[in-house]
Curated annotation (Swiss-Prot):
Lipidation (N-palmitoyl cysteine): 23
UniProt-annotated location(s): Cell membrane
Name of the protein described by the UniProt record: Uncharacterized lipoprotein MG260
Region (Disordered): 177-203, 218-255
Similarity field: Belongs to the MG185/MG260 family.
Domain of life: Bacteria
Membrane topology: Lipid-anchor
Residues carrying lipid (S-diacylglycerol cysteine): 23
Species of the source: Mycoplasma genitalium (strain ATCC 33530 / DSM 19775 / NCTC 10195 / G37)
Biased composition (Polar residues): 179-192
Signal peptide annotation: 1-22
GO CC, alphabetical: plasma membrane
Low complexity composition bias: residue spans: 236-247
InterPro entries per record: Lipoprotein_10_C (IPR004890), Mycoplasma_lipoprotein_cen_dom (IPR004984), P68-like (IPR054825)
Length: 765
């Protein structure tokens, strides 16, 4: 029942050929009753995978003797790999190797329903879940009978994450001398900042005043050399600035000077921040956010606008967007007044499947996409937009001050911030933060006689040797040895080994020639290589070479108390009537098997959602975690830093509390004592994220909870894709077409033509 880690792919793995496969409808079939319930998973998070394993073990240990056990089936290729696997098993009527449940997105239900293989969770008690987050089941194509076919158990949304010190330097450089600031901050911030030469003004409304005050606070934190001693402060809707320990400097000069090394000199130019008025409301809609980002790019030509061929060590732009499709979908949906009839596609009640005619016939969604794209296009032309391509997330760069702000998943908190005096591995044209679960590889010294020994690393006080060719007798693959087969990696390690040997036999310290890790780093087969796992490892082992290790000063990196976390822009333009939010995440989806297994599947799902258990920590989890009674669903989402849409969590009259466990850097929302009080006010002037402490406050989850609460109370409209067997291809192709346009800088007409061509004729049916 061990899980492997697989990197979720961001581009459709099946494309048009998979679309044709999906169009081939087969009749319902029964699976062979093998006496177990198989749960298919493509989880990539180590904590989520371990939590799921714990849940399954708990069920198997406590179920009634006659109940079927649960078995986890790992699917390669991420969520797209899971979609492809379901299509294959349905089309081939795989009766022996199919599964009963899968963690994936609702479009799989549409694929299953075409062959009557979707399992209706009738009889499962979903009363604990808020109906606003179950209603998407009515927007799944192909469903013949109303019901619950997909259950959201790991929800997230997208957030705006501002690098406070970077934005402070930008605004402080551009603002007019004597621009009003809040009385509190003006009294405490040193006036030794660089001489003002700009004409930017900061609006004096209350929301902007609070936001500017928080931006200044983050710059103070970045200047502060005593950050490790800073006390965490509980915050409420009335709090306006952080409290610091005695001796903490209130000067922002050090921070500004450090950021200036990255961003260069501010230039007062037309089309930039010249004569601009900064307002908090800028971040509430895409139109103004993109205009602001474009003005910043134009104001820093030496480091942003004029840099066309960026390396990973350069500024990546002003705004980072981790999911292009989410950004486009949210903006177009908001521009269409949050009405699914004005979106790219919606489920046609007559046919039961998605109708793409609104877009393909150039109706409202096409026109809104043109407006949205043209706003992005100005930023693209100024080289100010960074988009995620295949796992290169904004967090990788914003934490090193290479972006000013970004839109990213609320599940990404643990990736966004560097530790004090963080280390990173620097290559010739990019760098990565020093990964967790990493060991150094030493070259053999001249006294070691094995000619095919490439290097050694130590794991739990045990030496693990790396060999080429073959493993000598007395050593065992996966136990104390790993055989290296990649010729490029062998060559790099060989050269380092020979260089070390040339130092002479008197050398007593083995040279570090590389690093090895089981963390989730991108394999490129140039600097980072995938190798065999050790026998007891769940996740793929990698070897990192050609890297220089460097330790960074705190002011060179983003800490959690230097960020400002806001909602993703909820409108396209400020005049839009409704605010929207993205709701996303894999669902628990049932698959028809046979009468007995269907009953056993629903029995497990009902237990998962409703059975309260106290002793979760007895199963290889944190010793210091709380013992609060919770269901398996609550435990899973808490451990994975996601949100379970429980009615009680979204009770309008109750306070939302941010909580966390105490012994992991992958932070969670759990039932421990509160470490931060979250305001019900989702205004732009959000407080900076507090300094990470032993309570590990997860401000991303806190902000997401605020938004989900508003959606539950109909104060904001949650968007989720109408689900059809084709919508995954549509989403992936609009994302890849947009990302390509960021490079090529093509006009809207060329972008949209490339996108439509990529869809093929199957979308006009």
């Amino acid at each position: 029942m061990k899980l492997k880690g697989f990197l979720a792919v961001g581009v459709s793995v099946f494309g048009f050929s998979g679309l044709l496969m999906a169009c081939s409808v087969v009749s319902q079939f029964d699976q062979v009753d093998d006496g177990k319930i198989k749960l298919a998973s493509s989880l990539t998070s180590k904590r989520a995978a371990e939590a799921l394993e714990t849940v399954v073990k708990k069920y198997n240990d406590t179920k009634d003797p006659g109940d079927y056990p649960i078995e986890i089936v790992q699917i390669a290729g991420g969520y797209d790999g899971g979609k492809k696997d379901v299509q294959t098993k349905v089309s081939t009527k795989d009766k022996n190797n199919f599964y009963n449940l899968i963690l994936n997105y609702p479009e799989i239900v549409s694929t299953l329903s075409r062959s009557k293989m979707a399992l209706n969770f009738d009889g499962v008690n979903v009363d604990k879940l808020h109906p606003n987050f179950l209603s998407f089941n009515s927007r799944i194509g192909g469903i013949r009978d109303d019901g619950i076919y997909a259950i959201p158990i790991s929800m997230s949304t997208d957030l705006m994450v501002i690098n406070g010190p970077v934005l402070h330097y930008i605004l402080n450089s551009a603002r007019k001398e004597g621009t009003p600031t809040s009385t509190t901050v003006q009294a405490t911030v040193s006036s030794r900042s660089a001489e003002k030469k700009g004409t930017l003004e900061i609006a004096n409304d209350s929301e902007t005043t609070k936001l500017w005050q928080n931006i200044q606070t983050t710059a103070q934190n970045n200047s502060n050399e005593t950050t490790k001693e800073q006390k965490q402060v509980k915050r409420s809707s009335s709090s306006s600035s952080t409290t610091s320990t005695t001796g903490e400097t209130k000067d922002t000069t050090k921070s500004d000077n450090k950021i200036k090394e990255f961003w260069g000199e501010y230039q007062e130019v037309d089309g930039g921040l010249k004569n601009f008025t900064f307002k908090a409301s800028i971040f509430e809609n895409w139109n103004e956010t993109l205009d602001f980002a474009t003005r910043i790019a134009n104001s820093f030509p030496e480091k942003v606008k004029n840099i066309t061929n960026k390396t990973g060590l350069d500024l990546q732009g002003v705004l980072g967007v981790d999911s292009s499709s989410n950004a486009l979908y949210a903006a177009v949906f908001a521009a269409g007044q949050a009405n699914y009839d004005n979106f790219f596609f919606n489920i046609d009640k007559r046919t039961g499947y998605a109708d793409y005619s609104n877009f393909l016939n150039k109706d409202s969604s096409y026109q809104n996409l043109e407006s949205v794209y043209n706003d992005f296009y100005k930023l693209i032309q100024a080289n100010g937009l960074f988009v995620n391509r295949g796992g290169s997330y904004s967090s990788n760069f914003e934490k090193f001050h290479q972006l000013a702000f970004s839109v990213s998943s609320s599940g990404g908190y643990s990736y966004y911030f560097a530790k004090d005096n963080a280390k990173r591995l620097k290559f010739s044209n990019y760098a990565i933060e020093y990964p967790s679960f990493t060991q150094t590889i030493q070259a053999p010294n001249s006294s070691e006689t094995e000619s095919n020994l490439l290097g050694t690393f130590k794991l739990s006080e045990k030496d693990i040797n790396l060999y080429k060719g073959s493993i000598p007798s007395g050593k065992q693959q996966g136990v104390d040895a790993i055989l290296i087969s990649n010729p490029n990696l062998i060559n790099i390690l060989e050269q380092a080994k020979q260089k070390n040997t040339a130092q002479g036999s008197e050398s007593t310290t083995n040279k570090i020639i590389g690093y090895t890790t089981t963390a989730n780093v991108n394999v490129d087969n140039q600097n980072i290589f995938s190798v065999s796992k050790l026998n007891n490892e769940q996740f793929q082992r990698k070897i990192i070479v050609n890297a220089t290790e460097e330790t960074l000063d705190q002011s060179q990196t983003l800490q959690s108390n230097e960020s400002i976390v806001l909602p993703m822009p909820g409108k396209y333009k400020s005049t839009d009537k409704n605010k929207v939010m993205i709701t996303q995440g894999p669902n628990l989806i049932g698959i028809h098997a046979n009468e007995k297994e269907n009953i056993e599947t629903k029995k497990f799902v009902n237990w998962f959602l409703n059975q309260s258990i106290t002793d979760w920590n007895s199963n290889n989890q944190q010793k210091n975690s709380d013992q609060t009674t919770k269901t398996a669903a609550e435990y899973f989402t808490d451990q994975a830093s996601y949100i379970l849409p429980l009615k009680e969590k979204f009770n309008k009259s109750s306070d939302l509390e941010l909580k966390g466990s105490s012994s992991s850097s992958n932070l969670t929302t759990s039932s421990a004592s509160a470490s931060l009080l979250i305001s019900n006010n989702s205004s732009t002037a959000s407080s900076p994220a507090p300094k990470k402490t032993n309570n590990n406050s997860n401000t991303f989850t806190a902000k997401a909870l605020e938004l989900f609460q508003q959606a539950a109370n109909n104060e904001i409209i949650p968007f989720s894709d109408p689900s059809d067997f084709r919508n995954g291809t549509f989403r992936n192709n609009i994302s890849s077409s947009f990302n390509a346009a960021v490079n090529s800088k093509v006009s809207f007409n060329q972008f949209v033509q490339n996108f439509i061509n990529s869809l093929g004729s199957g979308f006009r049916r």
